[in-house]
Amino acid sequence: MAVVTTADNLNAQVVAVFPDKVRIVVDKLEDFKIAEESLRVGSYVRIADNENAVLIAIIENFQIVARDDGTRHHIIEAFPLGVLRDGKFERGGDSLAIPPKNVEPATIDDIRRIYSDSVSEAQGFCFSSLASNPEVRVPVNGNKFFNKHIAIVGSTGSGKSHTLATIVQKAVSEKAGDFTLNNSHVIVFDIHSEYKSAFPNANFIDVSNLTLPYWMLNSEELEEFFLDTEANDHNQRNVFKGAIIQDRRAKFQGDESERQRIHLDSPLFFDIQAVLDTAKSRNEDMIDTGETYQSGAKKGQSKLTQGSLFGKLTNFVNRLESKVNDRRLDFFLGERSKTITFEQTLESLIGYTATNKSNVTIIDLSGVPFEVLSITVSLISRLLFEYGYIYKRLRCANNPNEKVNNDVPILLVYEEAHKYVPNSELSKYRSSKVSIERIAKEGRKYGVTLLLASQRPSEISETIFSQCSNFIAMRLTNPVDQGYVKKLLPDSLGTLIDKMTSLRQGEALLVGESIVLPSIVQIDRCNPAPSSNDIPYWELWKEEWRDMDIEAIKAEWYR
């Protein structure tokens, strides 16, 4: 039971108050507990005054001090979280009267009230419990959580994939009425083929059924995909751009005035084979000099001279021809990519397919060749951002007084985000960085937000990572990553940040605009789980030798 500290029976008292710390002296620590639970670092205390206000603080550290008479007392330092006043919790502790009169461990009801009062039931979204007391659920404000960008960081084995799966599973299962599907739309970029098992009803896309229209690439993406961007060859650029515009205009069926306005970024079809044929022709171009041979075997024939680009486009032609003939790129350059419409592409990405309407779309990128990974992510991300932009424009045009810009908002989830948007200026990452940085800066206005998950946050583009307003920081062991995350989090977190190195699997520091106060939480287990379990090397190695079908591996490799 709680020990009531009175003037006659003073077991604990406040001896110092600082802006970010309260120092408490406890005479008998064994009596300073509640419900027979001993205090520990991370436990909560309540400090009362005569104004019916109760300061709630979390214990950060303690010391044992020996007195001259041989007895000992304990000095506890606690970080003030906020004040309970009239049964309601308020952030901040500067309204407490000095000196406080009463110190005791906080009750479970005190702790629950901190979190339960922070958000209404309609806006609450809960996926974790307090790590120090699993009976206390820790909700976040669902609107502030999802309409601001989110970051999940943690070393391998910290529970990052399970946390991501838990959040998405709970988001798509919440319903405000009696219907089958809620209105959530989540697109997961799955680079390691982990999440299909966690979302068995998802709209699943991999290289076997992924079709992206290459002709919808913008100018930067086209250059990165087809040109040797490091070579800085103006000839190949000019021929490439000119051939695309020429073929688009040739295939355009509209007015001549509209035809002349077609440019490299026009979202109109062009035939990549026609571009290749043009490049070959220019590379072999011979020009008539206007003279004829007067004698010999060529008598009467026109004299020809090599064109200005003769032989200068050989590398470009070979590169382009190699891509067109590369079967691994059929999802981008195959026959289907020439006939798929914009509507079909968008429907498949946001779960509106005729055969399977789904809240979650998983884009399995494990089979996408690394050299086109950035382009693939860039095109999909840009299309989804532009969907949000156009949808808002149409919605506001039809409803001038509408306050909700987008009533079908989407969440883009980037697993291992440092592989798409690294903190690097290399040209091979330029397209994906440009697309995702634009979403990070402007996406919220159009109902398109990000969830970035990474084990190496220090390698993510700082422009993108700094836009996140909600952080789920799990165990981080790399000092560089620890320092990077600490730099982005508020200084007022005190020792909570230092605990990142010792968090157990599934534990996380939850901080951001959506939660009433930074907290160490235990993330709920997802069900079903992603296939991210470690391979049991030692158990497998001890089993009997297994034969492998090398021919089957070769066939799949060469497919």
What kind of feature is each model-predicted range?
Residues 1-154, 162, 406-408, 424:
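Basic- and hydrophobic-enriched, low-structure N-terminal and domain-boundary segments
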Residues 124-212, 462, 510, 541:
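Glycine-rich phosphate-binding loop of nucleotide-binding enzymes
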Residues 155-175, 378-390, 433-434, 439:
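P-loop NTPase nucleotide-binding module
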Residues 189, 414, 453-454:
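Hydrophobic residues in beta-strands of the RecA-like P-loop NTPase core, especially within AAA+ ATPase
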Residues 193-199, 203, 224-435:
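P-loop NTPase motor domains
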Residues 228, 437-522:
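Conserved ATP-driven motor cores of ASCE-family P-loop NTPases powering translocation/secretion/packaging/pilus
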Residues 237-264, 498-528:
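Conserved AAA+ ATPase small/helical "lid" subdomain
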Residues 505-559:
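Conserved P-loop NTPase motor module
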